[in-house]
Amino acid sequence: MAKESPQEKEFLQLVKQHERIIYKLVNVYAVDEEEKRDLIQEILYQAWKGYAGFEGRSAFSTWLYRLSLNTIFTFRRKESRNGTKTGAVAAEPWEDEQANSSLEAKMLLKAIRELPELDRALISLHLDGYAHAEIAEVVGLTETNVRVRVHRIKKHLITTLNG
């Protein structure tokens, strides 16, 4: 077994530290367990491939979030072109104790999964506690646009959940 290089050790440590980002996004966008596994594997592959180019101009978590979203969107476009499953809304809730503990959380997750891809990314980042400036950096929008869109998404979710 080959010894890990310092770069590999650093990468693995950073991924371990921020793995929740990957799992949360995959659970929001993926339909079934097989698709989740495929996406996680592809995200990790793309992250390792791109890690040498990570210059630290943003936080690793921001870089990983952006890379994960790009990988998910590319994966879904490929599935769409190939005529395989895509765009379906997953029925199962997040594999998170807090989400599983209440009906409201399950309903919220279902409503989030029904949002367009970019809106899902915006609200996921917002719910993860990212500031509007950080979200703007991740998704490539202006901070003002992010603020407005997040506000509209929240209003839409409230309307949806209140029937």
Language model segments and positions:
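Amphipathic alpha-helical segment used for protein-protein interaction
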Residues: 92-137, 158
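DNA-recognition helix of helix-turn-helix
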Residues: 139-163
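Structural recognition of an alpha-helix C-terminal capping motif at a helix-to-coil junction
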Residues: 24, 38-45, 58-70
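Amphipathic, Lys/Arg- and hydrophobic-enriched alpha-helical face
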Residues: 15-33, 50, 112
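Hydrophobic positions on the alpha-helical face of helix-turn-helix-like DNA-binding modules
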Residues: 43, 67, 122-123, 135-136, ...
